[in-house]
Amino acid sequence: MIFSAGFFLRGINNPRNLDATRTGLGPTFGALQGGQIPRAAMKRAFLIILSILGFGHGANCVVAQADTWGKTTARPAEFYAASDVPASQVELTKQWHQVASRAWGNFGPLEFWIVGRSEKAARELDRKYCAVRKQKDPGTVLHYCLNRSHNFTDYARDGNAGLNTRRNERDKWSGFIITMSGKNPGPREEDYKPVVLHEYFHVYQHAHIHSRKEQTRKSLNQTNPWWSEGGAEYMAQLLYSRQKGVRANYLKEVMERKLRSSGSLQEGETIRDIPYGRRARIAYDLGAWFIAFLISKSSEEAYQVNFFKALETRGFERAFLDSFGQSSKALLEEFHNHFLSLSRRSQLKIIP
């Protein structure tokens, strides 16, 4: 599910010291003999005062940094966890983030916030979260942060996972915030691992859209879930299936279950038509199948590399045509009118 701030909600070392290291301008002027200050020192002091007045000082000073959005980084992800989250869950999340970043590149800045089942602990984590937001962007209003529409107590109550992409024309800080929880799926469920991969593939998708304009980002990523969620789901399950110790038939089993959603399509409806909401699961499931179908007709590189490389400059439809040789409309028609009518056995042949 996508919220207006670019927040994805997928249905289906814990730093304690959050104080920033601050670099102040304040030089120390020692007392001079006779109480007199040389003219040169007075001039330096005057210039420093002007700098403070012009640019701010201390915690409220935001140092302009080069915009490296979309470039891989050596900066590690940050991990924060509620007090009721076991260290084993933090380590599990780190492990699967590493699998994803090794496969698709390390993009950031990225934070993971891991919520347990205690609403009290989640409220404490919310306060910590808002302190971090204020630290990274002094313009953050704590009241609004603490009372945002979907906070950590919702995750403690309902579970699930999500990505909040912070990239707009208002905020000074751009980055990615992934939230994991203690249920739906929980850390003891196998699905927890591909869900970490799923959320990180959303990071990969958004890292390839440089624009700060909300409408541009929505257009390039597609408003309805068929494309972004289908892509994240298939690529996550595909990568998970290739890991050591995962049973050989895993991917076919998962994808066969997803085909059940084809029976829920309405007459004349395509996955592109289905918005986020109560029927979004159809777009998640069959969107994953559409990406598998697309890759079977081209290649993994055409989807994962070529398309996203061209997306920002060419736009969605031209990047699609360049990468796959046909329009999205034509391939969606083939997918619905031909592929989904094949036998189950024939459909599963495209799954590696």
Task: Show the residue positions of the predicted features.
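Short hydrophobic targeting helices and cationic amphipathic motifs
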Residues: 4, 8-9, 15-18
